[in-house]
UniProtKB/Swiss-Prot annotation:
Region (Interaction with tRNA): 150-152, 312-313
Biological classification of the source: Bacteria, Pseudomonadati, Pseudomonadota, Gammaproteobacteria, Enterobacterales
List of residues binding ATP: G12, M13, S14, G15, G16, V17, D18, S19, M38, G128
Keyword Disulfide bond on entry: yes
Gene behind this protein: mnmA
Organism: Photorhabdus laumondii subsp. laumondii (strain DSM 15139 / CIP 105565 / TT01) (Photorhabdus luminescens subsp. laumondii)
Protein name: tRNA-specific 2-thiouridylase MnmA
Chain residue ranges for the region called Interaction with target base in tRNA: 98-100
Length: 367
């Protein structure tokens, strides 16, 4: 085993079980470990949302238990400027962004990485992400996490091999139940804490209410493909392609009991377009165009490749071909049609366990 005792690692402590166990595992591996709690959101109002205070207390408790220092830093300005403003702009444009991807790109693996290296003299940062790193020929690769159910490489595809080389992912080698077992065994307060599902750093808010604070909702018609009006939506931003729940329209058309699905948004005219059945042709795509590309090895794609893609988190791998249109634009064709390919979300590419990178879906391609 290489001597890690001279190497300093700063663990991004979220107050959750994954980062807690990451800190412990790194300690076991002999590193000099300290924690860092990032405050990335200022408006921590009323009791329902006071999760940040609880998270900080939990992170502190874990660090005390492990006998390591916990630093805190406020990245709220960076988060607002580089993540949240973009998030709102995408919703305004009728797209459905993924703030976690942007947050990893701008905060956890940029602001945090720089702060740890420059202010805390760290050799590495570490996070509780379920991904793995492999170094080949002097370049770091991003691999899927060992626990297929928890793999988070989809959210980290913008990282470069240099950023990965400066990062450690201890729980990526484990399955989630094992992580909880370790936390319980060593008596960490976070052992039974449930996984967070809120928007990145904003916590478990009621999403519709939260979005409504920053973007005025514009109600408009819900229409079928044939132009028949079925009711009113409260704002296109509250709906995403393939959505079934929360449309407020029931049941039958010409005797069909099939549920209604969002199959398109007409942003220009503020119309939500719906159809019955989740395999409606308008919901299916044969491919997509993506831009804002990030390849982990930072090499530009110059020729067609065959690989697999995910167009959303936890989706089954989809075999596809990827053809470069320009340096920052690709055309992707799926082996079989895929439902609910959503502009604003990311398409992330893999060969085997290796995450190649990805880009933001600009448009879906249909027959």
């Amino acid at each position: 085993m290489s001597d890690n005792s001279q190497k300093k690692v700063i663990v991004g402590m979220s107050g959750g079980v994954d980062s807690s166990v990451s800190a412990y595992l790194l300690q076991q591996q002999g590193y000099q470990v300290a924690g860092l709690f990032m405050k990335n959101w200022e408006e921590d109002d009323d009791e329902e949302y006071c999760s940040a205070a609880t998270d900080l207390a939990d992170a502190q408790s874990v660090c005390d238990k492990l006998g390591i220092e916990l630093h805190t830093v406020n990245f709220a300005a960076e988060y607002w400027d580089n993540v949240f403003e973009h998030f709102l702009a995408e919703y305004r444009a009728g797209r459905t962004p993924n703030p976690d991807i942007l947050c990893n790109k701008e905060i956890k693996f940029k602001a945090f990485l720089e702060f740890a290296a420059e202010d805390l003299n760290a050799d590495y940062i570490a996070t509780g992400h379920y991904v793995r790193r492999r170094d080949i020929n002097g370049k770091s690769q991003l691999l899927r996490g060992l626990d297929n159910n928890k793999d988070q490489s989809y959210f980290l595809y913008t990282l470069s091999h240099q950023q990965i080389a400066q990062s450690l992912f201890p729980v990526g080698e484990l399955e989630k139940p094992e992580v909880r077992r370790i936390a319980e065994k060593i008596g960490l307060v976070t052992a039974k804490k449930k996984d967070s599902t809120g928007i990145c750093f904003i916590g478990e808010r009621k999403f519709r209410d939260f979005l409504g604070r920053y973007l005025p909702a514009k109600p408009g018609p819900i229409m079928t493909v044939d132009g028949e009006s079925l009711g009113e939506h409260q704002g296109l931003m509250y709906h995403t392609l393939g959505q079934r729940k929360g449309l407020g329209i029931g049941g039958t058309k010409e005797g069909s009991e099939e549920p209604w699905y969002v199959i398109d948004k007409d942003v220009q005219n503020n119309i939500l377009i719906v159809a019955q059945g989740h395999e409606h042709p308008r919901l299916m795509s044969t491919g997509l165009i993506a831009q804002q590309l990030y390849w982990v090895d930072r090499q530009t794609l110059t020729e067609k490749i065959h690989c697999v893609v995910k167009t959303r988190y936890r989706q089954q791998d989809i075999p596809c071909s990827v053809t470069p249109i320009s340096e920052d634009k690709i055309e992707v064709h799926f082996a079989n049609p895929v439902a609910a390919v959503t502009p604003g979300q990311s398409a992330v590419f893999y060969q085997g366990e290796v995450c190649l990178g990805g880009g933001v879906i600009e448009q879906r391609l249909q027959e």
